[in-house]
Structure formats: C-alpha cells, structure tokens
Design a protein with these regions (language model features):
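Condensing-enzyme catalytic core mediating Claisen C-C bond formation in acyl metabolism
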Residues: 1-61, 173, 178-219
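Short acidic, glycine/serine/threonine-rich loops at helix termini
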Residues: 16-17, 101-103, 142-143, 168-173
Length: 219
C-alpha cells in the first residue's frame, strides 16, 4: 500500500514581534556578564546573520495544543475527511503546554489527547500520543505514521508539530530572538498508486551528548 499526504494545515499566530521589541532587553554572556555592544548593534548583527526581522508569538490565551488544533482543523478540511476517520494522532513537541507567564510545561493529558478532545472525536480507536524527539520530531512522526500504514495498523494518520518556544527561552539570551511559535499538521493516508518514503534515517546520540539540552533549575 502506498501513502500520500492528502491534506496540510498550519497556524501562524497573530502577535507580530519585530526585532526592535528586543532593544530594551538585558542580554548577557554565558558567564552572566553584560555584552559590551549595544542592543542596537546586537540586533543588527543578528538580522545580518539570520535574515530574521520579525517573528510570531501565540496570544496569551493560547497554548501549543490550541495552535495544533487550529492547524489540524485546516489539514482535515484540506483533505476533505472527517476527524472520526483518523486512526492515529501523533503530536511532536518538546515542552508541552506552557501557559503565558509560566515556564512550567504541562503534558498530562497528552497534547495529542487534547487535540482529539478539541476535534470532538468520539471514536476510542483513534489513538492519540505525543512524540518528544527534539527538532526533527515531526519528521519522526511521519516515519511512524508511514510504518503504521505500511503494516496495515492504520489507514489515516494526523501528524502534528507545534511549539510555543517564546515561553521557554531565556530572556537574557540573545539567541531567544531566533525562536517563535506556531503549528503545522498533515493528513497521511493509504492510497493505491501514490508514493513512498524512499529512505529515512533516525538516530539518538546519548553518550556525552545526552545532556546538551536540559531544563534549568527551579527556584
């Protein structure tokens, strides 16, 4: 059985944050010392290197699962299918739902379950689970959806990637200007004569690399 992406959807938040919004930030070096350059110079260099002049942040009342729900609605509409026809909802993220003003991630119930609830899916056989896999989480979700379909365990999967990184970055880190919020989703279906994933390669490096990324201390 071949597969096809039959629908896609995204949600781009409305809150526009230009580079000039960072001019009053107190950026620090990794040792806690203040940069010698002015924020104006730092921001100009940042734009020259990255090409980024603005980014989008989620509204205060929305969390990652809300953005994912909006993107999923668009994907289902694009695919012209009912949410009740889904066999799996695979939601790739890293930090869960982080409420505005907090840095604490909330992952219970799973964000995929929250999306299923928002979509008002009654079918208990629609399995919803989260995938924490770093930056390539959505790609790994696609690989898993492909495996489910090829094995005959599923015919239709909803694969989502969403994050509200604006709520977990260090405000004193100049690299915080890189990150933004948003969501993307797609419907993957079994389809005769469609396509295949020709190759894929996943890996986890967990020796000295295991704690390159970590949560900071709580106070």
């Amino acid at each position: 059985m071949s597969i096809a992406i039959t629908g896609t959807g995204c949600y781009i938040p409305e809150v526009l944050v230009p580079n000039k919004a960072f001019e009053d930030k107190h950026f620090l070096n990794s040792d806690g010392s203040t940069f010698q350059q002015s924020n104006t110079v730092i921001i100009e260099k940042f734009k020259a290197i990255t090409g980024i002049s603005e980014r989008r942040y989620a509204k205060k009342e929305y969390n990652a699962s809300d953005l994912a729900f909006f993107a999923s609605q668009n994907a289902l509409e694009d695919a012209n299918i009912s949410a009740e026809d889904l066999d799996y909802i695979i939601f790739a993220h890293n930090f869960g739902d982080v409420s505005y003003g907090s840095s604490q991630g909330n992952t219970l119930p799973s964000l995929a379950t929250r999306v299923k609830n928002h979509l008002q899916i009654k079918n208990p056989k629609c399995v919803a689970y989260d995938l924490l896999f770093g930056c390539p989480g959505w790609i790994e979700g696609m690989i898993q959806a492909y495996a489910f379909i090829k094995s005959g365990m599923a015919r239709r999967c909803l694969v989502i990637g969403a994050e509200t990184l604006s709520r977990v970055v260090d405000p004193h880190d100049r690299d915080s200007m890189i990150y933004s919020d948003g969501a993307g989703a797609c419907i993957v279906e079994a389809k005769e004569g469609a396509g295949e994933i020709l190759a894929h390669n996943s890996a986890t490096y967990a020796n000295e690399e295991a704690y390159y990324l970590f949560h900071g201390s709580s106070y």
